[in-house]
Amino acid sequence: MSKSIEKMISHLKNQGFVFQGSEIYGGLANSWDYGPLGCEVKNKLKKVWWDFFVKKNPLNVGLDSSIILNSKVWKASGHIDGFNDPLIDCKNCKSRWRADKLIEEFDSSINTGIMTSAQLEDYINQNNILCKKCQKKDFTQIRQFALMFKTNQGVLEDDSSIVYLRPETAQGIFINFKNVQRSMRKKLPFGIGQIGKSFRNEITPGNFIFRTREFEQMELEFFFDPSDQKDWFKYWLDQIELFLTKKICLDKSNYKIRENLKDELSHYALKTSDIEFNFPFGWGELWGISHRSDFDLKVHQNLSKEDLTVLKEENNQKVLANVIEPSVGVERLMLAIFWQAYTEEQLEENNSRTVLKLPYNLAPYQVAITPLSKQLNQNAHQLFLELLKDFDAVYDETGNIGKRYRRQDAIGTPFVITYDFQTLEDQKVTIRYRDTMKQERILISQLKDFLNSQFN
């Protein structure tokens, strides 16, 4: 059966994973809330990332920096002066577009990142690119639109009180580099990981949770001596692949690694690679890894006048660390996981089922317990309470057994345990596998060992 992103979105809404933001007031463009099951997946995904990149890696430590920072941070990083999108308006229908995206959709081989506003305008005019909405060619001149959300701190609303919602989590790490290095007695190389909200006032967000104005990032800034001979870029790229394939079970056929060309690189980057995923709307960036040189520490050292170097004990020389940055959006990674997991299967006798084949470690519930008859409710519920001590379990006694199986398939529960009348005699329950629908009998006394073997 063919699947579509529209069907998947409807499924996720109906099953309690994702809801339209501010829905009772007509919604808010590209704003999403995560329901009871969605926030379980989200929290588990963040924990898996944190354990892999921070907690279980002896080189790295964690940080949780503020969303609102001193505006000088964004001046130093270049965001205030250069974090903009080129906008163009259609005079005929009043629609607003990103000029670079209009060109890229017209010809995907064009690298708009190196083009000036004048060059973007010339290309649109020379190639007769039309408004996507009304199919007319009557555009305004391009103007640069700031992507940072601006607000005021305190009771006065003047230039001195202007602050911004952070557009990335990275800068909070850079300005705390010396605090972390000193307090944790770290020597190069070491990394600082962070998970947190970021905000970008983008004009054309879309494709469900792929690109939103409010999003969550999982970023690692890895600091190393520029004279270090180890290829840390390759090391962290390999770690990303290991995480994707072994920790969250992404199929290798669904993603590819693309190294950015020199003219695609950001001004601070020596090297960048994108891990791209085959989303329902085509290939798109899933995860980025960049060699940021010493740009970040250097600009903050220059503006703050604070010494951000590290003293090398072997030669008593100061060094300004270089940085490798693996960065991924939580929601974008969730979209990739949902799209791979969402499956519509045709069964025998014209039956079908919709199943979320989520990785076991990301499923909202690991196991469901259900009684075959109302007479067994008390026994089954007691088993549920016992399993709840060690597993993410759910109890389900509504509807017939077939409907319960389909309901658990739809939300990705790997195993359903059925307590039946035979259980009273042999102390065995029926356990059903989500992906294969295979069933087998197992002793209640062996249930925990069985489940632990599946999840570990």
UniProtKB/Swiss-Prot annotation:
GO terms for molecular function: ATP binding; glycine-tRNA ligase activity; protein dimerization activity. The keyword Lyase does not apply. Keywords: Aminoacyl-tRNA synthetase, ATP-binding, Cytoplasm, Ligase, Nucleotide-binding, Protein biosynthesis. One of its GO terms (biological process) is glycyl-tRNA aminoacylation. One of its GO terms (cellular component) is cytoplasm. It comes from the Bacteria. Substrate binds at residues 98, 168, 215-219, 325-329. InterPro entries: aa-tRNA-synt_IIb, aa-tRNA-synth_II, aa-tRNA-synth_II/BPL/LPL, Anticodon-bd, Anticodon-bd_dom_sf, Gly-tRNA_synthase/POLG2, Gly_tRNA_ligase_bac, GlyRS-like_core. Pfam families: HGTP_anticodon, tRNA-synt_2b. The keyword Cytoplasm applies. Its EC number is 6.1.1.14. It is found in: Cytoplasm. ATP binds at residues 200-202, 210-215, 285-286, 329-332. It catalyses: tRNA(Gly) + glycine + ATP = glycyl-tRNA(Gly) + AMP + diphosphate. Catalyzes the attachment of glycine to tRNA(Gly). Belongs to the class-II aminoacyl-tRNA synthetase family. Homodimer. This is Glycine--tRNA ligase. It comes from Mycoplasma mycoides subsp. mycoides SC (strain CCUG 32753 / NCTC 10114 / PG1).
